[in-house]
Amino acid sequence: MARSGRYKVPFRRRREGLTNYRKRRKLVISKKPRLVVRKTNKHIIAQIVVAKPIGDETVAGADTRILTKFGWRGDENNTSAAYLLGLVVGYKARMRGVEEAILDIGLHRPTPGARVFAVLKGALDAGLKIPHGEEVLPSDERIRGEHIAEYAAKLKEENPDAYKARFSRYLQRGLEPERLPDHFEEVRKAIQQHYENKLAKIVAK
């Protein structure tokens, strides 16, 4: 409760932990499209957003559920899925004529190697130009899910029951987690081929 005339009530979205208005103002002033990354309990969402006087316009976007279109059978909320989502949204943005953007992670803590930066890495590999420091990007090994594959192989050998319980969702989808890096590469190639073909047709017109 306010106890002084100098007390300022924060904007509702700031009170609810949804928007950092100081950071948002800097992003809007840049006049560049924003790669907006948000997370839910089950999925990751990425959008290319352009600020306009009447409000934000979403130029391209998707969430990790789109990855099933390309055969993805892994988790939809891990680092590998985050990268693949960034790849998809990066290509979608380029198809709409967007070639550069700035990263908007909202109130997410900018921890190096975090999933929001895996999305960034995917968008960069799709050809978008986005200012960043290399130190924040996850390693290629982590993006490929090699840490998951190694842990799964060890657990399968030491405790098969725990392995089946821990990776039940993978196994239900027909994916052995030890194969995650190979599966990741298959899906990445499918995404690249799909969108590179579409971009080639746009350029040819």
Curated annotation (Swiss-Prot):
CC per GO annotation: cytosolic large ribosomal subunit
rRNA-binding keyword on record: yes
GO biological process, one term: translation
Gene3D superfamilies listed in its UniProt record: 3.30.420.100
Signal peptide: none
Keyword Phosphoprotein on entry: no
GO molecular function: 5S rRNA binding; structural constituent of ribosome
InterPro entries registered for this protein in UniProt: Rbsml_uL18_euk (IPR005485)
Keyword terms, alphabetized: Ribonucleoprotein, Ribosomal protein, RNA-binding, rRNA-binding
PANTHER family for this protein: LARGE RIBOSOMAL SUBUNIT PROTEIN UL18 (PTHR23410:SF12), RIBOSOMAL PROTEIN L5-RELATED (PTHR23410)
Matches recorded under NCBIfam families: PRK08569.1 (NF006342)
Physiological role: This is one of the proteins that bind and probably mediate the attachment of the 5S RNA into the large ribosomal subunit, where it forms part of the central protuberance.
Subunit composition and interactions: Part of the 50S ribosomal subunit. Contacts the 5S and 23S rRNAs.
Record family assignment: Belongs to the universal ribosomal protein uL18 family.
Alphabetized HAMAP family for the sequence: Ribosomal_uL18_A
Record's protein name: Large ribosomal subunit protein uL18
Organism of derivation: Pyrobaculum arsenaticum (strain DSM 13514 / JCM 11321 / PZ6)
